[in-house]
């Protein structure tokens, strides 16, 4: 994961300060790219402990086409809670509940979750129902039947529905590529990258998706290529980034998928294993909402 650490260092030394939507401020560079060869190990960051369970459940949630946080909260994954909570706080039903109390109510009260756990037509909706098109099923079918196609694309950026989303897609567009060695690669374009909190999560998530699609299309894994538009470090993450840059990376872990799974929608959390993951301690930071 030296590629990722090099990006952090590059932004620190060459980036410029920008004001942003969250009013926190960032150090930012535009148009960065890194490549991760999955044959060399699974690219899960080792210079801080990563929330592997959350990464897996979020991807499975996307693949279900789900856009309500209840599935995530029921599995103790709370990475999306802040956005619907901010919407709830503006409602007439808000009685001063904390984020923790809001999350507990999502878990315990299905009616409340249905009303206030919804994020709008975010990733899962666009992946599985982009104006009636199941993009995941379509791209897998195309990889199987027309692997040389230059149209192996999935887009979460639906301009007509952006205003209905709790958060417009940051990782907006990805394309698959099959080479002459029957290796499947994935290239993600991410319009906005929170380099400390979000990007390591995205690297692992799309590398997992690549691995799952490779299995169900009978291909080998190739590269994950990650292009980031506005690559930024939030001003309140600088100390955490410095701590991380002082740490030496460990050897990458190995991803093991249940080989009996032939349909991508049949994967469960129990079908995904990580072997020999060794990392440094967790580094906590606040998410910008």
UniProtKB/Swiss-Prot annotation:
Catalysis: reaction(s): dUMP + (6R)-5,10-methylene-5,6,7,8-tetrahydrofolate = 7,8-dihydrofolate + dTMP
UniProt pathway annotation: Pyrimidine metabolism; dTTP biosynthesis
Pfam families in alphabetical order: Thymidylat_synt (PF00303)
Active site, renumbered: 170
Gene Ontology annotations of biological process type: dTMP biosynthetic process; dTTP biosynthetic process; methylation
Gene3D superfamilies, per the entry: Thymidylate synthase/dCMP hydroxymethylase domain (3.30.572.10)
GO cellular component: cytosol
Keyword Ribosomal protein belongs to the record: no
EC number: 2.1.1.45
Keywords: Cytoplasm, Methyltransferase, Nucleotide biosynthesis, Transferase
Main location: cytoplasm
Function: Catalyzes the reductive methylation of 2'-deoxyuridine-5'-monophosphate (dUMP) to 2'-deoxythymidine-5'-monophosphate (dTMP) while utilizing 5,10-methylenetetrahydrofolate (mTHF) as the methyl donor and reductant in the reaction, yielding dihydrofolate (DHF) as a by-product. This enzymatic reaction provides an intracellular de novo source of dTMP, an essential precursor for DNA biosynthesis.
Listed HAMAP family: Thymidy_synth_bact
Subunit description: Homodimer.
Record's protein name: Thymidylate synthase
């Amino acid at each position: 994961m030296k590629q990722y650490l090099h990006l952090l260092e590059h932004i620190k030394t060459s980036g410029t300060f920008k004001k942003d939507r969250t009013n926190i401020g960032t150090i930012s560079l535009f148009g960065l790219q890194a490549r991760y060869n999955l044959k060399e190990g699974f690219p899960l960051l080792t210079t801080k402990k990563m929330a592997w369970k959350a990464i897996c459940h979020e991807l499975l949630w996307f693949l279900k086409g789900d856009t309500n946080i209840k599935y995530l909260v029921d599995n103790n994954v709370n990475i999306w809670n802040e956005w619907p909570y901010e919407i709830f706080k503006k409602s007439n039903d808000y009685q001063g509940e904390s984020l923790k109390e809001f999350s507990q109510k999502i878990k315990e009260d299905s009616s409340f979750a249905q009303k206030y756990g919804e994020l709008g037509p975010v990733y899962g909706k666009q992946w599985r129902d982009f104006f009636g098109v199941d993009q995941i099923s379509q791209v897998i079918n195309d990889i199987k039947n027309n692997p040389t196609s230059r149209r192996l694309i999935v887009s979460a950026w639906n301009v007509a529905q952006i205003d209905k989303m709790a958060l417009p897609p940051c990782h907006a567009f990805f394309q698959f590529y099959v080479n002459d060695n029957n290796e499947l690669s994935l290239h993600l374009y991410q319009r906005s990258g929170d380099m400390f909190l979000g990007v390591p999560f995205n690297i692992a998530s799309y590398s997992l998706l690549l691995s799952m699609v490779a299995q169900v299309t009978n291909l080998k894994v190739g590269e994950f290529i990650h292009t980031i538009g506005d690559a930024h470090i939030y001003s309140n993450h600088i100390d955490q980034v410095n701590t991380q840059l002082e740490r030496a990376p460990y050897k990458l872990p190995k991803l093991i998928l249940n080989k009996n799974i032939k349909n991508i929608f049949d994967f469960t959390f129990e079908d995904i294993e990580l072997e020999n993951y060794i990392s440094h301690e967790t580094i906590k930071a606040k998410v910008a909402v």
